[in-house]
Amino acid sequence: MTVSHEIGATKGRRSITIDRETPTDGYRENGWNVRASPLKDLCNPIRRIVDEMVGQANPDKSLISLAQGDPTVFGHLLPPKAAMEEVVGAFAACVHNGYTASAGMVEARDAVAARYSEENRRPLQAEDVFMTVGCSEALSHSFAALAVDGANILLPKPGFPLYETLCHRHGIKYKFYELDPENGWEIKLDDVRRLRDENTVAIVVNNPSNPCGAVFSEKHLRAICTTCEALHLPIIADEVYEDVFFDETRPFKSIAKFSGRVPVMAVSALSKRWLTPGWRIGWLVLHDYDHILQAAGVKLAINNLCQGSLGPPTPIQAAIPGIFQANEEIWLERTLTVLKSASTRCIERCARVRGLSVPCEPQGAMYMLLKMDPDAFKSEDGTYDDVVFAKRLLSEEAVLVLPGTCFHAPGYLRLVITVPDDELQEAWDRIEAFCERHSVERNFTDSPKEDVLVNGLIGKLQAMPVVDSVEDLQRES
Protein backbone atom coordinates (compact mmCIF):
# COMPACT_ATOMS: atom_id res chain seq x y z
CA MET A 1 0.00 0.00 0.00
CA THR A 2 1.35 3.42 -0.95
CA VAL A 3 0.28 6.15 1.42
CA SER A 4 0.63 9.91 1.63
CA HIS A 5 3.05 11.24 4.17
CA GLU A 6 1.23 14.58 4.49
CA ILE A 7 -2.48 14.09 4.06
CA GLY A 8 -4.30 17.37 3.67
CA ALA A 9 -1.31 19.24 2.28
CA THR A 10 -2.44 22.72 1.29
CA LYS A 11 -1.23 25.91 -0.32
CA GLY A 12 1.00 24.22 -2.86
CA ARG A 13 2.62 21.76 -0.46
CA ARG A 14 3.20 18.43 -2.15
CA SER A 15 2.39 15.13 -0.48
CA ILE A 16 5.20 12.59 -0.27
CA THR A 17 4.34 8.92 -0.67
CA ILE A 18 5.72 6.03 1.35
CA ASP A 19 5.52 2.37 0.35
CA ARG A 20 4.18 0.44 3.34
CA GLU A 21 4.61 -2.91 1.60
CA THR A 22 8.37 -3.20 2.17
CA PRO A 23 9.10 -6.82 3.21
CA THR A 24 9.19 -7.15 6.98
CA ASP A 25 11.86 -9.87 7.04
CA GLY A 26 14.52 -7.92 5.18
CA TYR A 27 16.19 -8.31 1.80
CA ARG A 28 18.20 -11.47 1.22
CA GLU A 29 19.04 -11.90 -2.45
CA ASN A 30 22.22 -12.07 -4.52
CA GLY A 31 24.41 -11.99 -1.46
CA TRP A 32 22.62 -9.08 0.22
CA ASN A 33 21.39 -9.42 3.80
CA VAL A 34 19.77 -6.14 4.80
CA ARG A 35 17.28 -5.99 7.63
CA ALA A 36 15.54 -3.04 9.25
CA SER A 37 15.41 -2.51 12.99
CA PRO A 38 12.12 -2.86 14.88
CA LEU A 39 11.79 0.93 14.47
CA LYS A 40 10.22 0.25 11.07
CA ASP A 41 7.08 -0.76 12.93
CA LEU A 42 7.14 2.28 15.23
CA CYS A 43 5.15 5.33 14.20
CA ASN A 44 2.92 7.99 15.61
CA PRO A 45 -0.44 6.26 16.33
CA ILE A 46 -2.19 8.94 14.29
CA ARG A 47 -0.51 7.61 11.16
CA ARG A 48 -2.01 4.15 11.55
CA ILE A 49 -5.50 5.58 11.29
CA VAL A 50 -4.89 8.49 8.93
CA ASP A 51 -2.89 6.40 6.45
CA GLU A 52 -5.98 4.24 5.93
CA MET A 53 -7.93 7.36 5.02
CA VAL A 54 -5.51 8.54 2.34
CA GLY A 55 -7.05 8.73 -1.11
CA GLN A 56 -10.59 8.41 0.23
CA ALA A 57 -11.50 12.10 0.01
CA ASN A 58 -14.37 12.93 -2.33
CA PRO A 59 -12.57 14.00 -5.54
CA ASP A 60 -15.49 16.22 -6.57
CA LYS A 61 -14.97 18.55 -3.61
CA SER A 62 -12.01 20.59 -2.44
CA LEU A 63 -10.30 19.09 0.58
CA ILE A 64 -10.67 21.04 3.82
CA SER A 65 -8.33 19.79 6.52
CA LEU A 66 -9.35 20.44 10.11
CA ALA A 67 -6.66 18.02 11.21
CA GLN A 68 -3.21 19.53 10.80
CA GLY A 69 -1.56 20.95 13.90
CA ASP A 70 0.43 23.42 11.79
CA PRO A 71 -0.91 26.97 12.26
CA THR A 72 0.84 28.21 9.11
CA VAL A 73 -0.80 26.04 6.44
CA PHE A 74 -3.60 28.44 5.49
CA GLY A 75 -1.37 31.50 5.38
CA HIS A 76 -3.56 33.81 7.45
CA LEU A 77 -1.58 33.41 10.69
CA LEU A 78 1.89 34.94 10.44
CA PRO A 79 4.85 35.16 12.84
CA PRO A 80 5.59 38.51 14.49
CA LYS A 81 7.47 40.82 12.15
CA ALA A 82 10.24 41.34 14.69
CA ALA A 83 10.94 37.60 14.84
CA MET A 84 11.31 37.39 11.07
CA GLU A 85 13.59 40.43 11.05
CA GLU A 86 15.80 38.89 13.73
CA VAL A 87 16.20 35.69 11.73
CA VAL A 88 16.89 37.56 8.48
CA GLY A 89 19.51 39.62 10.30
CA ALA A 90 21.14 36.52 11.77
CA PHE A 91 21.52 34.98 8.33
CA ALA A 92 22.65 38.24 6.72
CA ALA A 93 25.41 38.71 9.31
CA CYS A 94 27.15 35.61 7.91
CA VAL A 95 28.78 34.86 11.26
CA HIS A 96 26.47 32.03 12.32
CA ASN A 97 27.18 29.51 9.57
CA GLY A 98 29.17 27.05 11.65
CA TYR A 99 28.58 24.65 14.51
CA THR A 100 28.01 25.87 18.02
CA ALA A 101 28.00 24.03 21.36
CA SER A 102 25.90 20.86 21.11
CA ALA A 103 23.69 21.99 24.01
CA GLY A 104 23.14 25.32 22.31
CA MET A 105 24.59 28.76 21.78
CA VAL A 106 25.33 30.42 25.11
CA GLU A 107 23.50 33.62 24.12
CA ALA A 108 20.36 31.65 23.24
CA ARG A 109 20.54 29.61 26.44
CA ASP A 110 20.99 32.79 28.49
CA ALA A 111 17.90 34.30 26.84
CA VAL A 112 15.79 31.21 27.52
CA ALA A 113 17.01 31.09 31.13
CA ALA A 114 16.05 34.73 31.66
CA ARG A 115 12.61 34.25 30.10
CA TYR A 116 11.69 31.27 32.27
CA SER A 117 13.24 32.26 35.60
CA GLU A 118 10.50 32.41 38.22
CA GLU A 119 10.09 35.15 40.82
CA ASN A 120 11.34 34.36 44.33
CA ARG A 121 13.35 31.38 43.09
CA ARG A 122 16.98 30.89 42.15
CA PRO A 123 17.47 32.44 38.70
CA LEU A 124 18.02 29.91 35.96
CA GLN A 125 21.42 29.77 34.30
CA ALA A 126 22.47 28.86 30.77
CA GLU A 127 23.54 25.44 32.07
CA ASP A 128 19.90 24.74 32.98
CA VAL A 129 18.84 25.13 29.33
CA PHE A 130 19.32 22.82 26.35
CA MET A 131 18.48 23.99 22.83
CA THR A 132 16.79 21.32 20.72
CA VAL A 133 15.49 20.62 17.23
CA GLY A 134 11.92 21.62 17.99
CA CYS A 135 9.86 20.67 21.01
CA SER A 136 9.71 17.07 19.83
CA GLU A 137 13.43 16.58 20.42
CA ALA A 138 13.14 18.30 23.81
CA LEU A 139 10.48 15.75 24.75
CA SER A 140 12.59 12.92 23.38
CA HIS A 141 15.62 13.97 25.44
CA SER A 142 13.44 14.22 28.56
CA PHE A 143 12.14 10.70 28.10
CA ALA A 144 15.49 9.21 27.10
CA ALA A 145 17.30 10.70 30.09
CA LEU A 146 14.93 8.81 32.43
CA ALA A 147 14.86 5.53 30.48
CA VAL A 148 16.27 3.14 33.06
CA ASP A 149 15.39 -0.56 33.00
CA GLY A 150 11.75 -1.14 33.93
CA ALA A 151 10.88 2.57 34.01
CA ASN A 152 7.34 3.76 33.37
CA ILE A 153 5.95 7.23 32.74
CA LEU A 154 2.42 8.49 33.40
CA LEU A 155 0.78 9.96 30.29
CA PRO A 156 -2.44 11.99 29.92
CA LYS A 157 -5.54 10.46 28.37
CA PRO A 158 -6.65 12.07 26.09
CA GLY A 159 -3.16 13.12 25.07
CA PHE A 160 -0.68 13.84 22.31
CA PRO A 161 0.23 10.47 20.74
CA LEU A 162 3.91 11.37 20.34
CA TYR A 163 4.36 10.67 24.07
CA GLU A 164 3.44 7.04 23.50
CA THR A 165 5.72 6.81 20.47
CA LEU A 166 8.67 8.18 22.44
CA CYS A 167 8.10 5.66 25.21
CA HIS A 168 8.29 2.85 22.67
CA ARG A 169 11.40 4.35 21.08
CA HIS A 170 13.25 4.58 24.38
CA GLY A 171 12.04 1.31 25.88
CA ILE A 172 9.86 2.94 28.53
CA LYS A 173 6.57 1.51 29.73
CA TYR A 174 3.65 3.86 30.18
CA LYS A 175 0.36 4.16 32.01
CA PHE A 176 -2.49 6.52 31.22
CA TYR A 177 -4.09 8.80 33.78
CA GLU A 178 -7.50 10.25 32.99
CA LEU A 179 -8.43 13.84 32.24
CA ASP A 180 -11.91 14.89 33.37
CA PRO A 181 -14.14 16.54 30.72
CA GLU A 182 -16.65 17.46 33.42
CA ASN A 183 -14.02 19.65 35.09
CA GLY A 184 -12.25 21.42 32.26
CA TRP A 185 -10.18 18.35 31.36
CA GLU A 186 -8.30 18.60 34.64
CA ILE A 187 -6.09 15.73 35.78
CA LYS A 188 -7.79 13.12 37.93
CA LEU A 189 -5.18 13.17 40.68
CA ASP A 190 -6.59 10.09 42.39
CA ASP A 191 -5.72 8.29 39.17
CA VAL A 192 -2.13 9.50 39.45
CA ARG A 193 -1.86 8.29 43.03
CA ARG A 194 -3.24 4.90 42.05
CA LEU A 195 -0.93 4.43 39.06
CA ARG A 196 2.35 5.58 40.57
CA ASP A 197 4.64 2.70 41.59
CA GLU A 198 8.32 2.20 42.44
CA ASN A 199 9.24 2.21 38.73
CA THR A 200 7.42 5.42 37.82
CA VAL A 201 10.07 7.96 36.83
CA ALA A 202 7.91 10.94 35.75
CA ILE A 203 4.50 12.28 34.84
CA VAL A 204 3.83 14.24 31.64
CA VAL A 205 1.68 17.34 32.18
CA ASN A 206 0.52 19.08 28.98
CA ASN A 207 -0.76 22.61 29.53
CA PRO A 208 -2.28 24.18 27.44
CA SER A 209 -3.52 20.88 26.15
CA ASN A 210 -3.49 19.09 22.83
CA PRO A 211 -6.09 17.77 21.99
CA CYS A 212 -8.40 19.10 24.71
CA GLY A 213 -7.77 22.84 24.49
CA ALA A 214 -7.65 23.05 28.30
CA VAL A 215 -5.71 25.63 30.30
CA PHE A 216 -5.17 24.62 33.92
CA SER A 217 -6.03 27.03 36.72
CA GLU A 218 -3.46 28.07 39.31
CA LYS A 219 -5.40 26.07 41.90
CA HIS A 220 -5.14 22.91 39.82
CA LEU A 221 -1.45 23.47 39.03
CA ARG A 222 -0.76 23.78 42.75
CA ALA A 223 -2.71 20.59 43.41
CA ILE A 224 -0.67 18.75 40.78
CA CYS A 225 2.58 19.91 42.35
CA THR A 226 1.43 19.00 45.86
CA THR A 227 0.52 15.52 44.63
CA CYS A 228 3.83 15.07 42.81
CA GLU A 229 5.82 16.22 45.83
CA ALA A 230 4.02 13.71 48.05
CA LEU A 231 4.69 10.98 45.47
CA HIS A 232 8.29 12.13 44.81
CA LEU A 233 7.39 12.27 41.13
CA PRO A 234 9.30 14.49 38.65
CA ILE A 235 7.27 16.42 36.08
CA ILE A 236 7.83 16.63 32.33
CA ALA A 237 5.91 19.80 31.44
CA ASP A 238 4.92 20.11 27.78
CA GLU A 239 4.21 23.83 27.51
CA VAL A 240 4.67 24.34 23.78
CA TYR A 241 1.32 26.19 23.67
CA GLU A 242 2.42 28.66 26.34
CA ASP A 243 0.57 32.00 26.25
CA VAL A 244 -2.06 30.62 23.84
CA PHE A 245 -5.14 31.18 26.00
CA PHE A 246 -8.51 32.85 25.42
CA ASP A 247 -9.83 33.67 28.89
CA GLU A 248 -8.16 36.52 30.79
CA THR A 249 -9.47 35.05 34.05
CA ARG A 250 -7.50 31.86 33.38
CA PRO A 251 -4.16 32.85 31.83
CA PHE A 252 -1.41 30.36 31.15
CA LYS A 253 1.02 29.87 34.02
CA SER A 254 3.98 27.53 33.98
CA ILE A 255 3.75 24.67 36.45
CA ALA A 256 7.36 25.40 37.47
CA LYS A 257 6.05 28.49 39.25
CA PHE A 258 4.40 26.26 41.86
CA SER A 259 6.64 23.18 41.81
CA GLY A 260 8.36 23.58 45.20
CA ARG A 261 10.91 20.77 45.53
CA VAL A 262 9.51 18.84 42.57
CA PRO A 263 11.98 18.81 39.66
CA VAL A 264 10.38 20.02 36.44
CA MET A 265 11.68 19.35 32.94
CA ALA A 266 9.82 22.02 30.94
CA VAL A 267 9.79 21.91 27.14
CA SER A 268 8.66 24.52 24.66
CA ALA A 269 9.56 25.99 21.27
CA LEU A 270 9.02 28.84 18.84
CA SER A 271 6.70 26.61 16.80
CA LYS A 272 3.21 27.30 18.19
CA ARG A 273 3.57 30.40 20.37
CA TRP A 274 5.42 32.27 17.60
CA LEU A 275 3.74 30.42 14.67
CA THR A 276 7.00 29.08 13.24
CA PRO A 277 6.96 25.25 13.40
CA GLY A 278 9.21 24.99 10.36
CA TRP A 279 12.06 26.84 12.07
CA ARG A 280 12.65 23.71 14.18
CA ILE A 281 13.95 25.26 17.36
CA GLY A 282 12.90 24.34 20.88
CA TRP A 283 14.34 24.10 24.35
CA LEU A 284 14.39 21.98 27.46
CA VAL A 285 14.60 23.85 30.76
CA LEU A 286 15.48 22.13 34.03
CA HIS A 287 13.80 23.67 37.08
CA ASP A 288 15.91 21.59 39.46
CA TYR A 289 16.10 23.79 42.53
CA ASP A 290 17.12 21.00 44.91
CA HIS A 291 19.59 19.58 42.35
CA ILE A 292 17.75 16.25 42.27
CA LEU A 293 18.11 15.78 38.51
CA GLN A 294 21.74 16.85 38.61
CA ALA A 295 22.61 14.42 41.41
CA ALA A 296 20.85 11.60 39.57
CA GLY A 297 22.86 12.21 36.39
CA VAL A 298 19.81 13.26 34.38
CA LYS A 299 21.31 16.64 33.53
CA LEU A 300 24.49 14.98 32.24
CA ALA A 301 22.42 12.50 30.23
CA ILE A 302 20.54 15.32 28.50
CA ASN A 303 23.80 17.11 27.73
CA ASN A 304 25.17 13.94 26.14
CA LEU A 305 21.96 13.37 24.18
CA CYS A 306 22.34 16.82 22.63
CA GLN A 307 25.57 15.65 21.02
CA GLY A 308 23.55 13.39 18.74
CA SER A 309 22.04 16.18 16.63
CA LEU A 310 24.36 19.09 17.56
CA GLY A 311 21.33 21.28 18.15
CA PRO A 312 19.01 23.40 16.00
CA PRO A 313 20.19 25.75 13.22
CA THR A 314 22.76 28.21 14.54
CA PRO A 315 21.27 31.33 12.85
CA ILE A 316 17.88 30.65 14.46
CA GLN A 317 19.56 30.26 17.85
CA ALA A 318 21.32 33.58 17.29
CA ALA A 319 17.94 35.25 16.74
CA ILE A 320 16.44 34.02 20.02
CA PRO A 321 17.59 36.92 22.28
CA GLY A 322 16.11 39.51 19.93
CA ILE A 323 12.89 37.54 19.45
CA PHE A 324 12.36 37.35 23.21
CA GLN A 325 13.11 41.06 23.70
CA ALA A 326 10.71 42.27 20.99
CA ASN A 327 7.48 43.96 22.02
CA GLU A 328 4.84 41.78 20.41
CA GLU A 329 1.85 42.19 22.71
CA ILE A 330 -0.37 43.65 19.99
CA TRP A 331 0.56 40.86 17.57
CA LEU A 332 -0.15 38.17 20.17
CA GLU A 333 -3.48 39.72 21.13
CA ARG A 334 -4.56 39.82 17.50
CA THR A 335 -3.50 36.21 16.91
CA LEU A 336 -5.40 35.01 19.96
CA THR A 337 -8.49 36.92 18.80
CA VAL A 338 -8.39 35.04 15.49
CA LEU A 339 -8.15 31.70 17.30
CA LYS A 340 -10.88 32.60 19.79
CA SER A 341 -13.17 33.70 16.97
CA ALA A 342 -12.68 30.35 15.23
CA SER A 343 -13.32 28.48 18.47
CA THR A 344 -16.54 30.37 19.11
CA ARG A 345 -17.62 29.84 15.51
CA CYS A 346 -17.16 26.07 15.89
CA ILE A 347 -19.17 25.95 19.09
CA GLU A 348 -22.01 27.95 17.54
CA ARG A 349 -22.11 25.74 14.46
CA CYS A 350 -21.83 22.54 16.48
CA ALA A 351 -24.95 23.54 18.44
CA ARG A 352 -26.94 23.20 15.19
CA VAL A 353 -25.71 19.70 14.35
CA ARG A 354 -27.46 16.55 15.47
CA GLY A 355 -25.31 14.07 17.32
CA LEU A 356 -22.35 16.38 18.03
CA SER A 357 -21.65 18.48 21.12
CA VAL A 358 -18.85 20.40 22.81
CA PRO A 359 -18.43 19.00 26.33
CA CYS A 360 -15.93 21.65 27.36
CA GLU A 361 -15.31 25.06 25.80
CA PRO A 362 -11.66 25.37 24.64
CA GLN A 363 -9.63 27.70 26.81
CA GLY A 364 -6.42 27.71 24.78
CA ALA A 365 -4.02 25.87 22.47
CA MET A 366 -5.25 25.37 18.90
CA TYR A 367 -7.73 22.52 19.19
CA MET A 368 -11.14 21.46 20.39
CA LEU A 369 -12.78 18.11 21.02
CA LEU A 370 -16.29 17.36 19.81
CA LYS A 371 -18.23 14.55 21.44
CA MET A 372 -20.28 12.38 19.12
CA ASP A 373 -23.33 10.39 20.10
CA PRO A 374 -22.87 7.00 18.38
CA ASP A 375 -26.58 6.28 18.74
CA ALA A 376 -27.43 9.38 16.73
CA PHE A 377 -26.08 7.94 13.51
CA LYS A 378 -27.18 4.99 11.43
CA SER A 379 -24.98 2.57 9.51
CA GLU A 380 -25.41 -0.68 7.62
CA ASP A 381 -23.48 -2.79 10.13
CA GLY A 382 -24.88 -1.08 13.22
CA THR A 383 -21.57 0.49 14.31
CA TYR A 384 -20.77 4.17 14.09
CA ASP A 385 -17.73 5.16 16.11
CA ASP A 386 -15.43 8.15 15.74
CA VAL A 387 -13.15 6.40 13.23
CA VAL A 388 -16.09 5.46 11.00
CA PHE A 389 -17.43 9.01 11.26
CA ALA A 390 -14.09 10.56 10.24
CA LYS A 391 -13.58 8.18 7.32
CA ARG A 392 -17.08 8.69 5.93
CA LEU A 393 -16.93 12.45 6.39
CA LEU A 394 -13.75 12.49 4.33
CA SER A 395 -15.05 10.18 1.61
CA GLU A 396 -18.36 12.01 1.24
CA GLU A 397 -17.60 15.64 2.08
CA ALA A 398 -13.80 15.90 1.73
CA VAL A 399 -13.51 17.27 5.26
CA LEU A 400 -10.68 15.80 7.30
CA VAL A 401 -10.97 15.60 11.09
CA LEU A 402 -9.04 13.33 13.41
CA PRO A 403 -10.96 10.66 15.30
CA GLY A 404 -10.51 10.88 19.05
CA THR A 405 -9.21 7.32 19.01
CA CYS A 406 -5.90 8.81 17.79
CA PHE A 407 -5.63 10.48 21.20
CA HIS A 408 -7.12 7.64 23.29
CA ALA A 409 -10.42 9.51 23.32
CA PRO A 410 -12.87 7.21 21.52
CA GLY A 411 -16.19 8.85 20.81
CA TYR A 412 -14.61 12.26 20.19
CA LEU A 413 -13.39 14.17 17.14
CA ARG A 414 -10.51 16.67 17.17
CA LEU A 415 -10.69 19.87 15.15
CA VAL A 416 -8.03 22.54 14.72
CA ILE A 417 -9.09 26.17 15.11
CA THR A 418 -6.34 27.63 12.93
CA VAL A 419 -8.62 27.71 9.89
CA PRO A 420 -9.82 30.91 8.12
CA ASP A 421 -13.47 31.72 8.69
CA ASP A 422 -14.61 31.13 5.10
CA GLU A 423 -13.13 27.63 4.98
CA LEU A 424 -14.34 26.92 8.50
CA GLN A 425 -17.89 27.89 7.56
CA GLU A 426 -17.74 25.72 4.43
CA ALA A 427 -16.41 22.79 6.48
CA TRP A 428 -19.27 23.12 8.97
CA ASP A 429 -21.82 23.36 6.15
CA ARG A 430 -20.55 20.01 4.93
CA ILE A 431 -20.42 18.49 8.42
CA GLU A 432 -24.00 19.59 9.06
CA ALA A 433 -25.19 18.12 5.77
CA PHE A 434 -23.32 14.88 6.48
CA CYS A 435 -24.85 14.52 9.94
CA GLU A 436 -28.34 15.18 8.59
CA ARG A 437 -27.93 12.42 6.02
CA HIS A 438 -26.63 9.88 8.52
CA SER A 439 -28.66 10.79 11.60
CA VAL A 440 -31.25 8.55 13.18
CA GLU A 441 -34.66 10.22 13.28
CA ARG A 442 -35.08 11.08 16.93
CA ASN A 443 -35.42 14.06 19.23
CA PHE A 444 -32.28 15.46 20.79
CA THR A 445 -32.81 17.22 24.09
CA ASP A 446 -29.85 19.18 25.39
CA SER A 447 -29.28 19.50 29.09
CA PRO A 448 -29.98 22.90 30.71
CA LYS A 449 -26.23 23.27 31.31
CA GLU A 450 -25.54 22.79 27.59
CA ASP A 451 -28.32 25.24 26.67
CA VAL A 452 -26.82 27.93 28.87
CA LEU A 453 -23.34 27.34 27.44
CA VAL A 454 -24.45 27.35 23.82
CA ASN A 455 -26.82 30.32 24.13
CA GLY A 456 -24.15 32.31 25.92
CA LEU A 457 -21.60 31.54 23.25
CA ILE A 458 -24.02 32.37 20.44
CA GLY A 459 -24.59 35.72 22.11
CA LYS A 460 -20.85 36.33 22.29
CA LEU A 461 -20.44 35.38 18.64
CA GLN A 462 -23.21 37.70 17.48
CA ALA A 463 -21.67 40.57 19.43
CA MET A 464 -18.18 40.18 17.97
CA PRO A 465 -16.95 40.79 14.41
CA VAL A 466 -15.91 37.87 12.25
CA VAL A 467 -12.12 37.82 12.36
CA ASP A 468 -10.48 35.87 9.56
CA SER A 469 -6.87 36.90 9.85
CA VAL A 470 -4.35 39.10 11.60
CA GLU A 471 -4.51 41.40 8.59
CA ASP A 472 -8.25 41.93 9.20
CA LEU A 473 -7.51 43.05 12.72
CA GLN A 474 -4.76 45.38 11.57
CA ARG A 475 -7.17 47.03 9.16
CA GLU A 476 -9.72 47.52 11.95
CA SER A 477 -7.21 48.90 14.47
Q: Which residue ranges define each predicted feature?
A:
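Generic structural signal for small/hydrophobic residues in well-ordered secondary structure
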Residues: 49, 66, 112, 129, ...
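Conserved glycine-rich beta-strand-loop-beta hairpin in the small C-terminal domain of fold type I
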Residues: 321, 336-347, 358-375, 411
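Conserved core of the PLP fold type I
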Residues: 92-226, 243-258, 265, 424, ...
